[in-house]
């Protein structure tokens, strides 16, 4: 499953080709993703301009000019395949974070949602296992959305510190590695980076969370960041 750094790379690639541009057309080829694609998906996004492509934890967050927000998750196997009029060569594709050049014929049967953006760019959401999702909300309800409201602090945020981490670990009875995977403790950390962070901080993955205080918490917060 893509973790926070990989999702951030995808976000940057999408921002490069989508921000400030109009959604000309959308093809929803399958509605039955992990959460069904809303029936009014096309109606709400077609003709709208993407103002900002953001991220919250492992979710991509697209903010549109009318206040609509697109929430997307890559699941286990999801990819955003970017096709611009001139990116089918290795040289031009290297300008987009993530190197999104591809042969579209290899992925067509798994491309469930396709965005046609102004200037001829096409973004294809490919997800063979269909554990990903795309759904809609709006600015007023974003923070309280069921997929967002439980999330802990961003590990790259200035408010994520050792004392904050230590406080959020209190009361956890699972080993520290499992606690780090709890998105309510810190958002976006997955299996790979939990292991790496614990190793960098010199902590056993079996340690009890309540013992991660003081300098231990400071080291772990720094490693997670």
Language-model segments: which ranges?
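Basic, nucleic-acid-binding surfaces and adjacent catalytic neighborhoods in DNA/RNA-processing proteins
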Residues: 22-41, 54, 88, 164-225
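A cross-family signal for N-terminal binding/gating loops and helix N-caps
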Residues: 1-126, 131
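Generic detection of long, well-ordered alpha-helical segments
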Residues: 1-4, 105, 155, 159, ...
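Phosphate/anion-contacting hairpin/loop surfaces
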Residues: 70-187, 193-194, 198-200
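Short clusters of hydrophobic/aromatic residues that line enzyme substrate/ligand-binding pockets
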Residues: 45, 148-151, 203, 212
